[in-house]
């Protein structure tokens, strides 16, 4: 199969550092959010200043600098789906990013996970294509190998319950059939999203630290689909508070570097 043809050669015909150059004083940590409405809310709340841009056929995508608790961070809106998400962060890394903290929603495969509940993935099922260009073929990839303890302490400090487990990364959300969901649950999956496996593989390949956490949205562990808070306007205040947890983790990482 083509997906088994992993090539470890890092020098491609087109390399990200051909397109993007280092940005002076670029923050070490990039915090990224998928929801456009939520992203703009947080940028405005933290008084973000544009420091760079990426460009593609869909338009111009600003990179912002924000300050949270006296620490500087970059903010960038994540793109939906593994190829777009990975490609955009390939553009960001040459600017100077050393780690990425990614926040997004997910569908749950376990109905006991509450709406907007926090999920920390520990491994991802690689049911997409992008990760196979960055890592040898396998069904799973371990994710969040660093900073889990730090994030758990953030959640406990702020009184957020959470679950940990396997996520299913897929390319085709309209092909989440009942039989496929059952098989992924047998593999241990408790939720489904579209980017985690590929982002971890790319960051491993590029030597970049990566941490992703999810908040539960629609419920697929049911005879029919239950969208719950999947809408970008639903429970927005709760999601804003969840988004700030990413910055709490980023601060904890920065403070740990100073110890």
Where would I find each of the regions flagged by the language model?
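Zn-dependent metallopeptidase/amidohydrolase metal-coordination segment
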Residues: 197-234
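Non-catalytic positions within long, well-ordered alpha-helices that form the structural scaffold/packing
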Residues: 93-94, 185, 204
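Flexible, glycine/charged-enriched surface loops at secondary-structure junctions
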Residues: 50-55, 159-165, 253-259
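Active-site rim beta-loop-alpha module in soluble metabolic enzymes
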Residues: 138-186
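His/Asp/Glu-rich mid-to-C-terminal helical/loop segments that flank catalytic regions of hydrolases
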Residues: 222-259
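Metabolite-binding pocket within alpha/beta catalytic cores that recognizes anionic/polar moieties
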Residues: 1-141, 145-149
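Short acidic/polar active-site loop segments enriched in Thr and Asp
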Residues: 98-99, 190, 209
């Amino acid at each position: 199969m083509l997906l088994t043809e992993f090539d470890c050669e890092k020098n491609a015909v087109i390399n990200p550092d051909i397109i993007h150059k280092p940005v002076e004083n670029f923050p070490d940590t990039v915090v990224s959010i998928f929801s456009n409405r939520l992203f703009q809310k947080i940028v405005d709340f933290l008084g973000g200043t544009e420091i760079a841009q990426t460009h593609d056929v869909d338009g111009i995508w600003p990179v912002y600098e924000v300050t949270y608790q006296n620490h500087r961070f970059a903010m960038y809106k994540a793109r939906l789906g593994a190829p777009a998400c990975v490609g955009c962060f390939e553009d960001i890394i040459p600017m100077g990013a050393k780690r990425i903290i990614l926040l997004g929603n997910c569908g749950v495969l376990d109905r006991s996970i509450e709406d907007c509940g926090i999920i920390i993935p520990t491994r991802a099922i690689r049911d997409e294509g992008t990760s196979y260009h960055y890592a040898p073929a396998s069904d799973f990839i371990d994710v969040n190998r660093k900073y889990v303890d730090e994030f758990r302490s953030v959640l406990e400090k702020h009184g957020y319950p959470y679950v940990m487990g396997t996520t299913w990364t897929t390319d085709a959300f309209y092909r989440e059939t009942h039989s496929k969901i059952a098989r992924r649950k047998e593999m241990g999956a408790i939720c489904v999203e579209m980017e985690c496996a590929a982002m971890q593989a790319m960051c491993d390949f590029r030597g970049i630290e990566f941490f992703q956490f999810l908040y539960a949205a629609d419920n697929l562990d049911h005879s029919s689909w239950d969208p719950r808070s999947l809408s970008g306007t639903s429970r927005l205040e709760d999601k804003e508070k969840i988004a700030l947890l990413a910055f709490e983790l980023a601060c904890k990482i920065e403070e740990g570097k100073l110890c």
